[in-house]
From Swiss-Prot:
Keywords: Aminoacyl-tRNA synthetase, ATP-binding, Cytoplasm, Ligase, Nucleotide-binding, Protein biosynthesis. It catalyses: tRNA(Ser) + L-serine + ATP = L-seryl-tRNA(Ser) + AMP + diphosphate + H(+); tRNA(Sec) + L-serine + ATP = L-seryl-tRNA(Sec) + AMP + diphosphate + H(+). The keyword Ribosomal protein does not apply. Catalyzes the attachment of serine to tRNA(Ser). Is also able to aminoacylate tRNA(Sec) with serine, to form the misacylated tRNA L-seryl-tRNA(Sec), which will be further converted into selenocysteinyl-tRNA(Sec). The gene is serS. CDD domains: SerRS_core (cd00770). Its EC number is 6.1.1.11. This is Serine--tRNA ligase. InterPro entries: aa-tRNA-synt_IIb, aa-tRNA-synth_II, aa-tRNA-synth_II/BPL/LPL, Ser-tRNA-ligase_type_1, Ser-tRNA-synth_1_N, SerRS_1_N_sf, SerRS_core, tRNA-bd_arm. It comes from Bacillus cereus (strain ATCC 14579 / DSM 31 / CCUG 7414 / JCM 2152 / NBRC 15305 / NCIMB 9373 / NCTC 2599 / NRRL B-3711). Consists of two distinct domains, a catalytic core and a N-terminal extension that is involved in tRNA binding. Pathway: Aminoacyl-tRNA biosynthesis; selenocysteinyl-tRNA(Sec) biosynthesis; L-seryl-tRNA(Sec) from L-serine and tRNA(Sec): step 1/1. L-serine binds at T231, A232, E233, E285, S385. It holds the Pfam family tRNA-synt_2b.
Length: 424
């Protein structure tokens, strides 16, 4: 959520920056109307309440003096009715304003490339050499099915499309990657491990920006009004909702493994085979709470931490600086890390690393004090995938495949795989 005072005093500047996102700003113009009316109603209500108090005191005086107070009593009733009507209108205006504020996306950072679509994203850097195959590389779903380590068909029978059973060496590879990533981020990168709930309430989904705008993308448990988490970012960020932190606690860095659940409502017909786009998938998420002046340095560190996973796995990748039209709703700046997938002949996203500045913290009321008695300020929050496990499995299967269909296990994972070197 944006700062309403900043929006009020910089309305045209904010509008111009949001236009770079390519957002429909039809409702945005109502901000000035609603904000002005809200302030008018506050003034009118306070004036009438003040008058009501004065009249009440006058009535008390007249009654003590045993004088007729009927006219003033009628006047106070009229004032009370007006106050009630104004309070009702104020409540409606504030609810409308709140809904509008929750629907306004974050302001792009000045360093985000200006553009409309993913074609306008900018390559920040690349790492590793793309392998040249002397044979036609197989897609990971064919490799895994032939090896008996992934079973999409039976998962479709048990649940439906976009689900999978991991079996044997496939299940162990998934588990190895989870442990490897958590060990790396906690032991070498300084994150504290967190294992979060997989269900959250509506306030949590609103705090991180999934609601109200993207409710159709979420799996909701109607009986409890809980939501299955689309990412560990949601519960982990909301750990500190409605809290005031001390300056000494910052930065806070969490690494959280979780399963993630997404309806993929807007992805019909895309990536229908394999592990790239599943309704349920595993991910290690990195979440940070930092002082505002440190957040862009911390974004670079977070992105580097996610990159390190791919470097140790020796998987070629590139880092994209996302343009203003491809930032997503909550980010002020975002990097996507894309790993090379041979069967696609291109790079595919495996991590998004974002700085939300105070956007989430304002929605979730997460603040800190620089001094013990200082005025609370909103922290800046960041998060990034470190990494998406299923897509990492897909990248390993395809990049490490041999002509006979076996898979070389990356050296860094072998201790987690019982010393095995090949999946066959």
């Amino acid at each position: 959520m944006l700062d309403i005072k900043f929006l009020r005093t910089n309305f045209e500047e904010v509008k111009a920056k949001l236009q770079h996102r390519g957002e429909d700003l039809t409702d945005f113009g109502r901000f000035e109307e609603l904000d002005t009316r809200r302030r008018e109603l506050l003034v009118q209500t306070e004036e009438l309440k003040s008058k009501r108090n004065e009249v009440s005191q006058q009535i008390s005086v007249l009654k003590r003096e045993k004088k007729d107070a009927e006219a003033l009593i009628l006047e106070m009733r009229e004032v009370g009715e007006k106050v009630k009507d104004l309070d009702n209108e104020l409540r409606t205006v504030e609810e409308d304003l709140e809904r509008l504020m929750l629907s306004i996306p974050n302001i792009p950072h000045e360093s985000a490339p200006v553009g409309e679509t993913e074609d306008d994203n900018v390559v920040a850097r690349t790492w590793g050499e793309v392998k040249e195959f002397t044979y036609e590389p197989k897609p990971h779903w064919d490799l895994a099915t032939d090896l008996g380590i992934l079973d999409f068909e039976r998962a479709g029978k048990v649940t439906g499309s976009r689900f999978v059973f991991y079996k044997g060496a496939g299940a162990r590879l998934e588990r190895a990657l989870i442990s490897f990533m958590l060990d790396l981020h906690t032991d070498e990168h300084g994150y504290e491990e967190v294992l979060p709930p997989y269900m959250v309430n509506r306030a949590s989904m609103t705090g991180t920006g999934q609601l109200p705008k993207f409710e159709e993308d979420a799996f909701r448990i109607e009986s409890e009004d809980y939501f299955l988490i689309p990412t560990a970012e949601v519960p982990v960020t909301n750990m500190h909702r409605d809290e005031i932190l001390n300056k000494e606690q910052l930065p806070i860095r969490y690494a959280a493994f979780s399963s993630c659940f997404r309806s993929e409502a807007g992805s019909a017909g895309r990536d229908t085979r394999g592990l790239i786009r599943q309704h349920q998938f595993n991910k290690v998420e990195l979440v940070k709470f930092v002082k505002p002046e440190d957040s862009y340095e911390e974004l670079e560190k977070l992105t580097n931490d996610a990159e390190r996973v791919l470097q140790l796995l020796e998987l070629p990748y590139r880092v994209m600086s996302m343009c203003t039209g491809d930032l997503g709703f909550t980010a002020a700046k975002k990097y996507d890390i894309e790993v090379w997938i041979p069967s696609y002949g291109t790079y595919r996203e495996i991590s998004s690393c974002s700085n939300f500045e105070a956007f989430q913290a304002r929605r979730a009321n997460i603040r800190f004090r620089r001094e013990p008695n200082g005025k609370p300020e909103h922290v800046h929050t960041l998060n990034g995938s470190g990494l998406a496990i299923g897509r990492t499995v897909a990248a390993i299967l395809e990049n490490y495949q041999q002509e006979d269909g076996t898979i070389i296990i990356p050296e860094v994972l072998r201790p987690y795989m019982g010393g095995k070197t090949v999946i066959k």
